[in-house]
């Protein structure tokens, strides 16, 4: 840590962990973007990020299912209710950070304090899968649990054991528009993960 970064403000994660007790999937990013980029006060708040469009495609066959196009935001109440019903938990791998350049890019974040990963998994006794979104989130998670994720291809998962439970760590395409893949193609990867974890029911329009 340099003197120049020491002078930068420390940001604490702005959102509470979303941890439905029956969740079978935990989605972990790195840290939210700066508030000026938000279209709502919740996870994946950048309107150009495609995470909630991917969810819409996989479960409803409609990338705009959770999108409020008129107001350029997301239908947050419907989104939270859906994730709670399906058993999808969300938080990030970093609790406190410094932004070295003011962006949300992994390479521009200095980790001050990591999130309590063990505590999250203990709070989710039925969790069978973890999606670490982004390289820094994956690195922090794999280093913490001693997982060898080298040569791990897109769409694959690596199993690890936490307190007697076998859990799969999944690698999926980034939902950021900076990742060069159409949202429909990204959704195909996520679809397989959701199916493997048993998140679909007869009413869902899986791919």
What are these regions (language model features)?
Residues 20-22, 85, 164:
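A generic fold-level signal
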Residues 85-144:
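Internal catalytic-core helix/loop-beta-alpha segment
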Residues 40-109:
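Short, surface-exposed acidic-centric catalytic microdomains
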Residues 20-30:
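Short, hydrophobic/glycine-enriched beta-strand segments
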Residues 18, 80-83, 122-123:
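Short, conserved, surface-exposed binding loops centered on an aromatic residue
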Residues 22-23, 126-128, 166:
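A general structural motif
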Residues 1-17, 33-35, 45-47, 54, ...:
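C-terminal capping/extension of enzyme domains
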């Amino acid at each position: 840590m340099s003197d120049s970064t020491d002078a930068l403000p420390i940001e604490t994660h702005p959102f509470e962990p979303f941890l439905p007790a029956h969740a079978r999937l935990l989605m972990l990013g790195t840290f939210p973007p700066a508030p000026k980029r938000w279209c709502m006060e919740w996870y994946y708040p950048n309107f150009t990020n495609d995470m909630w469009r991917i969810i819409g495609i996989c479960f409803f066959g409609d990338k705009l299912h959770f999108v409020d196009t008129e107001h350029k935001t997301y239908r947050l109440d419907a989104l939270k209710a859906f994730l709670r019903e399906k058993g999808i938990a969300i938080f990030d791998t970093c609790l406190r950070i410094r932004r070295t350049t003011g962006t949300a890019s992994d390479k521009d974040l200095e980790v001050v304090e990591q999130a309590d990963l063990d505590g999250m998994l203990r709070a989710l006794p039925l969790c069978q899968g973890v999606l670490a979104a982004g390289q820094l989130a994956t690195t922090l998670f794999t280093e913490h649990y001693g997982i060898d994720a080298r040569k791990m291809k897109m769409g694959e998962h690596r199993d690890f054991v936490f307190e007697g439970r076998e859990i799969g760590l999944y690698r999926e395409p980034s939902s950021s528009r900076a990742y060069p893949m159409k949202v429909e193609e990204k959704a195909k990867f996520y679809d397989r993960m959701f199916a493997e974890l048993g998140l679909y029911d007869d009413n869902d329009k899986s791919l």
